[in-house]
């Protein structure tokens, strides 16, 4: 079982001493568990790790991110479901209660799975509400840009594993496209960071 006290020790005093960061710290730890698992699967050949969580875990941006986003050129919906089912089985074998709760969204062009962790926050003492929602979204979509991924080592919380990512130039162009398409503040922040 995950121990929040152990995870906190990987962070500077300013963060680990502030319980307001605990849910973010936990989410980031679970994201790293998932990425570490995926790095050892055959699907790794068809994906590149992108988005805000890439900036956090690979580049060191000083903001937490919610989702795991992948650029997957030749990954079918069935392969995506199989891949995320593997993630769920891995998390269950790691001692976590996990459920996939998928919502139909006709506007969504990406493949998405919402991986819920029922009662995890309550069990860890991070919430007084058993039913408080805690989830990680895994999304995959082909970005329409042909590029050779770069293998980088992702490290943190005691994890160390290789993962394909876009080059800095490609990642920057993806962030510019996101900024122009949706105009969210985090996209401007991310672009200034790059």
Which residue ranges define each predicted feature?
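Catalytic metal-binding acidic patch
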Residues: 52, 59-80
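Catalytic cores of NTP-dependent nucleotidyl/adenyl transfer enzymes across multiple folds
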Residues: 13, 32, 123-194
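Short gly/ser-rich loop at a beta-strand->alpha-helix junction or flexible surface loop bordering the NTP-binding
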Residues: 46-54
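Conserved catalytic core of two-metal-ion nucleotidyltransferases
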Residues: 30, 88-134, 170-171
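Helical scaffold of the NTase/Pol beta-like nucleotidyltransferase catalytic core
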Residues: 1-47
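Long, highly charged amphipathic alpha-helices
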Residues: 33, 82-89
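Short amphipathic alpha-helical segments
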Residues: 26, 30, 76-83
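Short, solvent-exposed loop/turn segments at secondary-structure junctions
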Residues: 54-56, 105-106, 143-145
């Amino acid at each position: 079982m995950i121990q929040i006290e152990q995870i906190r020790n990987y962070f500077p005093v300013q963060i680990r001493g502030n319980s307001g960061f605990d849910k973010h710290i936990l989410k980031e730890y679970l994201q790293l568990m998932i990425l570490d698992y995926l790095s050892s699967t055959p699907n790794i050949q068809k994906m590149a790790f992108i988005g805000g969580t890439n900036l956090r875990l690979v580049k060191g941006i000083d903001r937490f991110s919610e989702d795991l986003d992948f650029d997957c050129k030749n990954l079918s919906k069935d392969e995506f479901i199989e891949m995320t089912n593997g993630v769920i089985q891995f998390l269950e074998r790691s001692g976590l209660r996990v459920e996939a709760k998928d919502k139909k969204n006709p506007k969504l062009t990406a493949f998405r799975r919402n991986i819920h962790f029922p009662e995890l926050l309550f069990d860890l003492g991070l919430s007084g509400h058993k039913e408080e929602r805690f989830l990680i979204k895994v999304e995959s979509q082909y970005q329409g840009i042909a590029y050779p991924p770069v293998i980088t080592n992702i490290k943190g919380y005691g994890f160390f594993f290789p993962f394909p990512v876009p080059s800095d130039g490609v990642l920057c162009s993806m962030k510019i496209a996101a900024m122009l398409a949706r105009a969210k503040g985090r996209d401007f922040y991310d672009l200034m960071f790059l």
